[in-house]
UniProtKB/Swiss-Prot annotation:
Main location per the UniProt record: cytoplasm
Family matches, as InterPro entries: L-lactate/malate_DH (IPR001557), L-lactate_DH (IPR011304), L-lactate_DH_AS (IPR018177), Lactate/malate_DH_C (IPR022383), Lactate/malate_DH_N (IPR001236), Lactate_DH/Glyco_Ohase_4_C (IPR015955), NAD(P)-bd_dom_sf (IPR036291)
PANTHER family from the UniProt entry: L-2-HYDROXYCARBOXYLATE DEHYDROGENASE (NAD(P)(+)), L-LACTATE DEHYDROGENASE A CHAIN
Recorded GO CC terms: cytoplasm
Single GO term (MF): L-lactate dehydrogenase activity
Pathway: Fermentation; pyruvate fermentation to lactate; (S)-lactate from pyruvate: step 1/1
Keyword Oxidoreductase recorded: yes
One Pfam family, short name: Ldh_1_N
Gene, per the UniProt record: ldha
Descriptive protein name: L-lactate dehydrogenase A chain
Taxonomic source organism: Cyprinus carpio (Common carp)
């Protein structure tokens, strides 16, 4: 007796379709992981999304919840398992797993807790997706990107930290608020550590090619009557503020991760401030990962843009590197 499906459909093709070339895995289905997942889905970036976590019930529930929205998405396959075989042949793997930053806790304080988690995660990712591009989002992101690079054995162009992509977005949002202009037309870069020692490049801040330091030479200094310095302070404080108010950050960092995935998967060659190995640049001598403007495309991080920094900006960047190295050198990998 023929089934309903057999009565409805005549199968024509004998060929098994090839797997997707744009598969994305998100490791960790916490607030950040799910914000990244939904942002990636809503941008139509992937034909297959895989989710992995150690918490099986939470993982199953999140996957079901997304699958129930399949009608509203263009991603035909959403899979989830605690077994990493589900991640096989991913093009991009977004790592958001790790211990969560507590109220008042610095990102650097999180570090050894998350290093131990990475020792399990990274080898499993590489086992099933040896050709993937790793996008590290877990904090402290710069140190954990270094850790992922060391543990994975991947070339540096395929290990990227989300870095100050979000800090720069926050900066441009606040700059836009101050000027009454959309953030996409407010150009400013925050580089260095994703965290307390990040460096705002005031010398490059511009709108429509008009450099604001040309209009206000004191911009970013203590002498500035308009107190633009407070814009960067708000960038640094914003995560702490959001954590204090709602307990965690999720939406903006999720959108930031999807933004980076888009540049990679669509081969856009867009320039982003992301965390990469900066040894030998801007006077940094240690093997640290920090954010500088990088071009992202199909093979990962293809180029680094050499910023023209003022001496005080370069000094701050070196100080940022020293802060990270101080923590990094004592890690047990």
């Amino acid at each position: 007796m023929a089934s309903t499906k057999e009565k409805l459909i005549t199968h024509v093709s004998k060929e098994e379709p090839a797997g997707p070339t744009n598969k994305v895995t998100v490791v960790g289905v916490g607030m950040v992981g799910m914000a990244a997942a939904i942002s990636i889905l809503l941008k139509d970036l992937t034909d297959e999304l895989a989710l992995v976590d150690v918490m099986e019930d939470k993982l199953k529930g999140e996957a079901m919840d997304l699958q129930h929205g399949s009608l509203f998405l263009k991603t035909h396959k959403i899979v989830a398992d605690k077994d990493y075989s589900v991640t096989a042949n991913s093009k991009v793997v977004v790592v958001t797993a790790g211990a969560r930053q507590q109220e008042g806790e610095s990102r650097l304080n999180l570090v050894q807790r998350n290093v131990n988690i990475f020792k399990f995660i990274i080898p499993n990712i590489i086992k099933y997706s040896p050709n993937c591009i790793l996008l590290v989002v877990s904090n402290p992101v710069d140190i954990l990107t270094y850790v992922a690079w060391k543990l994975s054995g991947l070339p540096r162009n395929r290990v990227i930290g989300s870095g100050t992509n979000l800090d720069s977005a926050r900066f441009r949002h606040l700059m836009g608020e101050k000027l009454g202009i959309h953030p996409s037309n407010c150009h400013g870069w925050v580089i260095g550590e994703h965290g307390d020692s990040s460096v705002p490049v005031w010398s490059g801040v511009n709108v429509a090619g008009v450099f604001l330091q040309g209009l206000n030479p004191d911009m970013g200094t203590d002498k500035d009557k308009e107190d633009w310095k407070s814009v960067h302070k708000m960038v640094v404080d914003s995560a702490y503020e959001v954590i204090k108010l709602k307990g965690y950050t999720s939406w903006a960092i999720g959108m930031s991760a999807a933004d980076l995935c888009q540049s990679i998967l669509k081969n856009l060659r867009k320039c982003h401030p992301v965390s990469t190995l900066v040894k030998g640049m801007h006077g940094v001598n240690e093997e640290v990962f920090l954010s500088v403007p990088c071009i992202l495309g199909n093979s990962g991080l293809t180029d680094v843009v050499h910023m023209t920094l003022k001496s005080d900006e370069e000094k701050q960047l070196v100080k940022s590197a020293e802060t990270l190295w101080g923590v990094q050198k004592d890690l047990t990998l």
